[in-house]
Design a protein with these regions (language model features):
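Aromatic "clamp/platform" in nucleotide-sugar-dependent glycosyltransferases that forms part
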Residues: 306
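Active-site proximal beta-strand in glycosyltransferases
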Residues: 101-103, 114-136, 143-144, 165, ...
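Short hydrophobic beta-strand element within catalytic cores of glycosyltransferases
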Residues: 323-326
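Membrane-proximal helix-turn-helix segments that form the acceptor-binding/catalytic region
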Residues: 144-164
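Conserved acidic donor-binding segment of nucleotide-sugar-dependent glycosyltransferases
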Residues: 338, 342-349, 358-363
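A conserved mid-protein helix/loop that constitutes part of the nucleotide-sugar donor-binding site
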Residues: 21-27, 224-247, 262-268, 350
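Carbohydrate-associated surface elements
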Residues: 170, 192
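Short alpha-helical donor nucleotide-sugar binding micro-motif in glycosyltransferases
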Residues: 285-286, 293-298
Length: 407
């Protein structure tokens, strides 16, 4: 019996060190794909030695897949003059990747797929409507400069999707209101974390590994670690976080920044100007296993974003037993309970510093098991399994109907 084919479209290479929740989610969908499915990924090449424009047999997280790199993208953590999404979409034209199921994690590439047959699903990871209205750096996203053009494109493309999944309840509701004729296709979907990678340690193990990290960084054994992980882009507002560290009047606290991006140089400059070089370590992009280790031993994870969906990194922190401090953005404030984190009502260095201080001084109020409990419903094996089960059921019904018609 033929297997149903799922083709995933996104502008990255899963074997390259890359930063971002979308990439992590796609990797998880591939890892936990049931054997009943054939999985394909249309992505990018990581260097000039890789063959471009041909299907290649590959393996990811123990799963055999077919991989099609559209073009070479050597560093997707830093944006170029021409947005990567534009390059990726342009490279899609003239090709046909028709499949039983097609998952798009950006809207724009689906322009090339308008006439393709098969069931298409759009995953919405951020609230684009909030992004286009956000104040601040105009380089945050291209569409902020041309919101009318984006919404015109959205109106053109949205009807082709059989399903529209959003990890942001407000965004899902807005899509239902904007497109009432397809409101039954729009649904909220839980983001998910891989609990085989992100899990808590015992208190003794945690303290021992924390001391080891402090020793490696030539810091006091009493150091309390604050972890930030994500792209250094305007959306994440790392400058706000650095200023919050300057406002945090707590000895033996140290910020770990795991990530890279276009604001890396600006962040380094801010650190130097505020005299924080001894209180902040920039780690750059790190492998997921190393990130998981940092989640397990940090005292608190911090999210300073201007806008979000439900960032995977928050689920990963909670699943590792680490409390979260966040600005009021996206789904994270709805996820956190009083014993798993703190939501800052104001996006200011002082407010963020006060929230960090609250968790650092009173860890007993944010026990590890409370954090793990908050993340538990989002475990990947359960969330991803349910999505695939629904897909397979629809595929079987469609094929049974086709066979019945033939007979």
């Amino acid at each position: 019996m033929r297997k149903p084919v799922l083709t995933i479209f996104y502008q990255f290479n899963p074997w390259q060190s890359t930063i971002g929740g979308i990439q992590t989610l796609i990797n998880t969908f591939i890892k936990y794909a049931p054997s009943e499915f054939e999985v394909r990924l249309v992505g990018t090449g990581c260097d000039r030695t890789q063959t471009i424009g041909k299907w290649q047999a590959a393996e990811l997280a123990g799963r055999e897949i077919s991989f099609f790199p559209l073009f070479t993208l050597e560093n997707d953590n830093v944006r170029s003059l021409i947005p990567t999404t534009v390059k990726y979409t342009a490279a899609m034209f003239g090709r046909c990747f028709t499949s039983d199921f097609m998952h798009f994690h950006r809207l724009e590439p689906s322009l090339a797929a308008l006439n393709w047959q098969g069931e298409k699903t759009l995953f919405i990871h951020n609230d684009i409507h909030t992004q286009t209205k956000a104040a601040g750096d105009k380089n945050a996203i291209l569409w902020r400069r041309f919101p009318a053009a984006y919404f015109a494109l959205e109106s053109l493309l949205v009807n082709q999707f059989s399903q529209i999944f959003s990890c942001n309840t407000d965004s899902a509701q807005l899509y239902r209101q904007r497109y009432p004729h397809i409101e039954d296709r729009v649904a909220y979907i839980k983001n998910s974390f891989d609990n085989e990678i992100f899990y808590p340690l015992s208190q003794e193990q945690r303290q021992a590994q924390r001391r080891e990290l402090a020793k490696m960084l030539n810091l006091s054994e009493e150091t309390r670690f604050i972890l930030f992980a994500g792209r250094l882009h305007p959306q994440k507002d790392p400058i706000l976080l650095v200023r919050a560290i300057a406002a945090l009047n707590e000895p033996h606290t140290h910020l770990l920044i795991a990530g890279d991006g276009e604001l890396a140089a600006a962040v380094r400059t801010e650190i130097a100007q505020l005299g924080l070089s001894s209180r902040v370590t920039m780690l750059g992009a790190i492998p997921i296993q190393e990130l998981a280790r940092l989640h397990r031993i940090s005292n608190v994870f911090v999210l300073s974003s201007a806008y979000e969906g439900l960032p995977l990194v928050v689920l990963e922190a909670l699943a590792s037993g680490t409390a979260v401090v966040t600005t009021r953005c996206g789904e994270t404030p709805k996820l956190l309970a009083a014993d798993s984190g703190v939501v800052c009502e104001q996006r200011s260095p002082e407010s963020l510093a006060a929230a960090l201080q609250q968790v650092i001084l009173h860890p007993e109020n944010y026990p590890s098991m409370s954090c793990v409990r908050a993340a538990h419903p989002y475990a990947a094996r359960t969330v991803v399994r349910d999505v695939y089960n629904d897909m397979f059921t629809r595929w079987e019904k469609q094929n049974f109907s086709a066979v019945s018609c033939i007979n």
